[in-house]
Amino acid sequence: MQAKQQLLIDGAWVDGDAARFAKTDPVSGETLWTATAASATQVEHAVAAARQAFPDWARRSFAERQAVVERFRECLETHREHLATAIAQETGKPLWEARTEVGAMIGKVAISITAYHERTGERARDIGDARAVLRHRPHGVLAVYGPYNFPGHLPNGHIVPALLAGNAVVFKPSEQTPMTADLTLQCWLEAGLPAGVINLVQGAAEVGQALAGSADIDGLLFTGSAKVGGLLHRQFGGQVDKILALELGGNNPLVVKDVPDREAAVLSILQSAFASGGQRCTCARRLIVPHGAVGDDLIDALTSAIAELRVAAPFSEPAPFYAGLTSVEAADGLLAAQDDLVARGGRPLSRMRRLQAGTSLLSPGLIDVTGCDVPDEEHFGPLLKVHRYRDWDEAIALANDTRYGLSAGLIGGERADWDDFLLRIRAGIVNWNRQTTGASSDAPFGGIGDSGNHRPSAYYAADYCAYPVASMEAETLVLPETLPPGVVL
């Protein structure tokens, strides 16, 4: 399987008509993929192709659509190592983690089929001499925007349920990960998906703006930053005829009540803050620990563990815990964010540094910002802020001091503490003695506040990929025995 380095419109691979762009490996510097972006006209052609393909695809039985999706899963199995290598190269993540991402893509098919039947599907019951029937119908043409941190798994979590429901799709991946999208779309064609049911438009913000501005899409499914999600929300303002599903970021708190097992607590913090190099939307960004010996001892142990954490190139042996960020520019932004926190009074406990010039490899950063005036921003990388608290109420207040509400975690405490935390914390994913990045594949995924609205790319994705239709129906038209008051026939 080789990348086409083109757009996919109505079943045909075509060159873009706009500016040329390229994707380079953020660690090695190798050019991985280069092509021309889609023009606004080509975006409209892709939408038109999806619109034309939609009726026939929607009329097919669910079993027929499921068969195509299951063949797609088989294609992923066949090409899993090639896809994993591409993901590792594009994102900078370790090969072992890229392999787990492809595994998640494969697993998403069975999960989405189950979710379709449980969350949507069809229900019926008798009511007198009629039947009440609940059905679900696809919206039509859905635009799917993919993020760069999980370029296979997260868009897949939109696309698979959208296609199962009978929608047609126009997919706009991140310009940071065009190759993964290219290869994934080849798998859809290999699976026998009809021409036009899925289309691929490559490029940067201009392509995304053109797609979001198309009058002929019926909805947009987005996973990405709160900034871009907010722009889309404003752009869609007043368009009540369109579904907009947003899964955005978070400034996620991890609260330490006490430390029953220091090594276990340190590991949970490392996995919460630095998994994928901090490039997960559920990563802990704020570590909230008590003043005094409990907090001091934990921070000392954490600092020591950070110093030993292996960070290296994606294909290194022995394998690293995490590797590079998705781009050198992203690494530059993280280093600038650290400098800003220091300028605001933050005290570095473990300073984040670039490990190799010209690359996106960064060491983990840990900075104490207790009492500092710091922005409520998601620093999307290996940078963890420490806040100290004096009592439980202050810990909860610090945890909730954010406009976001994606994930939160509690380490230690008794059942009563957990119950109180669960009641008072504002987040869509709340974990106890497990990392904040841990989530069940058959549970909703998403948050409140500026972290989004629906629960995109997870079990509840079926909810926004189809709309319910309620019917009262009978085989024959029958005159009732008793007429309504005031009616004479």
UniProtKB/Swiss-Prot annotation:
SUPFAM superfamilies, A to Z: ALDH-like
Pathway terms, separated by semicolons: Amino-acid degradation; L-arginine degradation via AST pathway; L-glutamate and succinate from L-arginine: step 4/5
Binding site for NAD(+): G224, S225, A226, K227, V228, G229
Keyword Oxidoreductase: yes
Reaction(s) this enzyme catalyzes, per UniProt: N-succinyl-L-glutamate 5-semialdehyde + NAD(+) + H2O = N-succinyl-L-glutamate + NADH + 2 H(+)
Superkingdom classification of source: Bacteria
Enzyme Commission identifier(s): 1.2.1.71
Cited CDD domains: ALDH_SGSD_AstD
GO MF annotation terms: succinylglutamate-semialdehyde dehydrogenase activity
Stored InterPro entries: Ald_DH/histidinol_DH, Ald_DH_C, Ald_DH_CS_CYS, Ald_DH_CS_GLU, Ald_DH_N, Aldehyde_DH_dom, Aldehyde_DH_Superfamily, SuccinylGlu_semiald_DH_AstD
EC top class named in words: oxidoreductase
Keywords, comma-separated and alphabetical: Arginine metabolism, NAD, Oxidoreductase
GO process terms (BP): arginine catabolic process to glutamate; arginine catabolic process to succinate
Active site: E247, C281
Family: Belongs to the aldehyde dehydrogenase family. AstD subfamily.
Biological function: Catalyzes the NAD-dependent reduction of succinylglutamate semialdehyde into succinylglutamate.
Protein name: N-succinylglutamate 5-semialdehyde dehydrogenase
